[in-house]
């Protein structure tokens, strides 16, 4: 059987920063584009957080959180160890071992579920961060954008949509001579 291991550290901050630490490694090889272990990690985090929120009835009705909401304010490092890792491409920037994804997801969910349920106060704060991120995402996606009624080439300058910051109306009134 193939030996698999995963170690991770995660830290949630009160707000998100531009350069959040998120690093992934396989057998100490940096995987800049993540891959199976990162996807499994996110999946496990999401499952554990959904379960925690469901047990405590924290999640507002109709709001759905996703993995990106859970890690929005988090910094993390994931280190996986595999006997025969499969990488996508020769540069080893992305792990492509499907079996390892399920392993990491299960391990992450189990560990985080136990931690959240033994540290409920901190767990609720983390859940609030995820809920806040989900609400921000939902609000941004529901922002009404102007529907394009005309499909085709872009309009010339005179006919293009006006800039709401500098908009005006120009009226031309006819004169006596019909002009």
Regions found by a protein language model. Give the residues of each.
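Single conserved hydrophobic/aromatic residue that forms the stacking wall/gate
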Residues: 170-179
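GHKL-family ATPase ATP-binding module
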Residues: 1-171
């Amino acid at each position: 059987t193939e030996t698999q291991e995963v170690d991770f550290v995660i830290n949630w901050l009160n707000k998100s920063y531009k350069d959040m630490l998120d690093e992934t490694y396989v057998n100490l090889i940096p995987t800049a584009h993540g891959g199976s272990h990162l996807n499994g990690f996110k999946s496990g985090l999401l499952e554990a957080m959904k379960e925690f929120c469901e047990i405590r009835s924290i999640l507002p009705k109709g709001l759905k959180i996703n993995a990106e909401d859970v890690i929005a304010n988090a910094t993390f490092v994931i280190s996986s160890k595999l006997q025969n890792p499969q990488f996508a491409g020769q540069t080893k920037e992305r792990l492509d071992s499907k079996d390892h994804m399920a392993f990491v997801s299960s391990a992450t969910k189990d560990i985080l579920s136990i931690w959240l349920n033994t540290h409920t106060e901190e767990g609720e704060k983390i859940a609030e961060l995820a809920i806040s991120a989900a609400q921000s995402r939902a609000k941004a996606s529901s922002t009404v954008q102007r529907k394009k009624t005309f499909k085709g080439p872009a309009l010339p300058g005179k006919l293009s949509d006006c800039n709401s910051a500098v908009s005006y109306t120009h009226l031309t009134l006819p004169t006596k001579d019909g002009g």
